[in-house]
Amino acid sequence: IRLSLVGSEMCIRDRVTVVNFWYAGCAPCRVEAKDLESVWREYGGEDVAFIGINTRDQADTAQAFSDEFGITYPSLIDVNTAEAKLAFSEVVPIQATPTTLVLDKQGRVAARIIGPIDGTSILSTLVKDALAETP
């Protein structure tokens, strides 16, 4: 799977991938932002990818949110076409924001968290479990 970001591409094939649907005015998104960044800093790298999918904001607003909360993993803006949201709709409809998905190395949804993550432990465990899976 390839995701196009602003001016670049990100390959998530053979990687555990955390996908977080968010927007700047979402109060629970603001609460979970630092925890998501912590898990990204702990696991992000060759084996784990993180991608934020902003469902409502323009690029300037999304960037201001990332700057305010120290978010270093990439996000894409999915406002005009909702292509990213639609890509998951047949497998796991995104009905609330925030929603966080953990995809296994085969790109299958291994876990879904509806609403804010509550601290780092649950997401860390889900990422560890997905990394430990053998195809």
Predicted regions and their residues:
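Thiol/disulfide oxidoreductase modules built on the thioredoxin-like
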Residues: 67-71, 80-131
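N-terminal targeting signals for export/organelle localization
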Residues: 1-2, 132-135
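Single conserved hydrophobic/aromatic residue that forms the stacking wall/gate
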Residues: 1-7, 11-12
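Structural microenvironment flanking redox-active thiols in thiol-disulfide oxidoreductases
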Residues: 30-69, 80-88
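Hydrophobic beta-strand anchors of alpha/beta hydrolase catalytic cores
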Residues: 18-19, 50, 100
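Short cysteine clusters
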Residues: 11, 26-29
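Aromatic-flanked redox-active Cys/Sec active sites in thiol-based oxidoreductases
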Residues: 20-26
